[in-house]
Every structure is written in structure tokens, then in C-alpha cells.
């Protein structure tokens, strides 16, 4: 069984799709109904529907579904339909990227910037089966914390890594290096290291630039900087960014990736951020450009 392959042209016909994973936001009300509706559309095209054990906790009966572990689901699925918002896609991206499985997001959240479809557009899932799609490959970050000679934290991020003080009453002092060469020292609440995908999230709210996905830059944006400092730095994806926190006044500093639980740093830790070896593959079936989506979701340029 082969996953849908990346396209060099704008469109290509996909091979036979046999299995589709449905990944719902299990913490959202009404998700059982959404799963059943999506499964009905997928089955109309002759494919089997995969759920993981976690999905059964929302009241779905296993009858008619293939119930797999997450790892087996990643191996078996031809593509994934994520039912939720951007947070659900971020959680799935880390799981799917090493297996190169494409993701089709169906928004049941708020802005849903990464989602391709709104829930009333479920039937457009059929375009994937008909070969009417493109794949948008999104750069990810590899984030690791080195403590002495030991890697004590490592993860991937589709949006951003955030290094931030744990108290609203303390400021942090962070030394930023690029390929081990000093760039600056940032005083403030912290720093956001973002992908182009994450440039329209927390980074944008902090005053960072909007970066189109194909640019593949790494941006470094201070959070509430103290004093006169640049609002952002842009680096090549081939660079390695290192953040060295300085600890004083009993400060606590955490690193978090894509909104996941923070990992507490200690004196002497080095946080390394670089382009990840994998990417997130987002299915597109509507043909919207990045800028039309930007205007739609963020109402930029509208009266």
C-alpha cells in the first residue's frame, strides 16, 4: 500500500485509496456525529474507515470501523481526515509527518487557518478520491534541549517553539545564536521561533511578519521586548538557531512546541531549533491561494 505521493505538478490522479483515518478532537462536543457523517462520505467511495482507540471514547461504536493503534493507523492510512481546529491538526502533524501521510483538515473550531474544509463542505472529501487535489508541504522545526551532553527534550513543531518566562512578573534574558555565532540578547517575556505556517499564529500577534509557506524561513520574534530591539529576525532554513537562557532572580523559563505542555529549563541548558527532516503534508481540494485564505481567515484588507 502506497501513500499519496507528493506532486511536482499542480494536480495528479491518486492511486486506489483503500483506508482513511478519521482523527477527531475528542474533547469537543458533538464529535461523534461529525465522525459518522465523515465516515459515510468516505465509504461512498469504497474506502474503509480507520479509528484509533482514543476515538472510541466519544461514544462511537467500533462496528464498521477498523480500530488500530496510532502507529498502525499511520502505516495503513492513505490519508487522514482531521475533524477539529488548528490545534487538532497540530497534534496530528507530529504523528503523521514521519510516515508522510497527507492530512485533510475539516474545521469544527474557530479560525481554522490550516483546515481546508468547513464541516458543511464534508462532501468535498470526494475530490481526493477523484484526484482533484494538491499537496501543500509545510516545513517543520526540530526542537531539542541539550543539558550538558544529554538531550533531555526533543520534539517537532509545525507552528512554533516558544521560550518564555514562567511568571508574568519576571522578564527573561535570552542569548540568540545562529550557527553558534551570537546574534543578539533579548530582554522581555520570551521569544517565538516560528515556521512560515506559524507566522500567522502567535508570531503574528507578537508583531512578527507574515511569511508565505514556500519561503521556508525560520523567524525569531521577541515577546514584549524590553528596550529598543528589532521586532523580528529571519533566518535561512539551513541555519541552526540556539537559545541560551540566563537565569537570575529565581526565574523559571519553559520551552513549549505547538501549544503542548511546557518543559522547564535549567541553568546551562541550550535550546536548539533547526529545520526538521520531515514536513507536514496538507491536502488542498479547493484551489484557494495562500493570500486569499489569509484575507478570509484574518480579514486583512477587508472594509
Model region roles, listed by residue range:
Residues 91, 96-106, 113:
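Gly/Ser-rich helix-loop-strand patches that form or flank binding pockets
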Residues 163, 168, 179-182, 230-303:
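ATP/nucleoside-binding phosphotransfer catalytic cores, i.e., glycine-rich phosphate-binding loops
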Residues 27, 86-88, 111, 197-199:
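Short glycine-rich anion-binding loops that position phosphate/pyrophosphate groups of nucleotides
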Residues 1-79, 91, 119-136, 145-155:
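ATP/NTP phosphate-donor binding region
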Residues 31-32, 87-92, 200-205:
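Short glycine/serine/threonine-rich phosphate/pyrophosphate-binding segments
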Residues 110-189:
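Catalytic core of DAGKc-family lipid kinases
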Residues 22, 82, 193:
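Redox-cofactor binding/interface segments in oxidoreductases and associated redox assembly factors
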Residues 184-188, 193-229:
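Gly/Ser/Thr-rich active-site loops/lids in small-molecule metabolic enzymes
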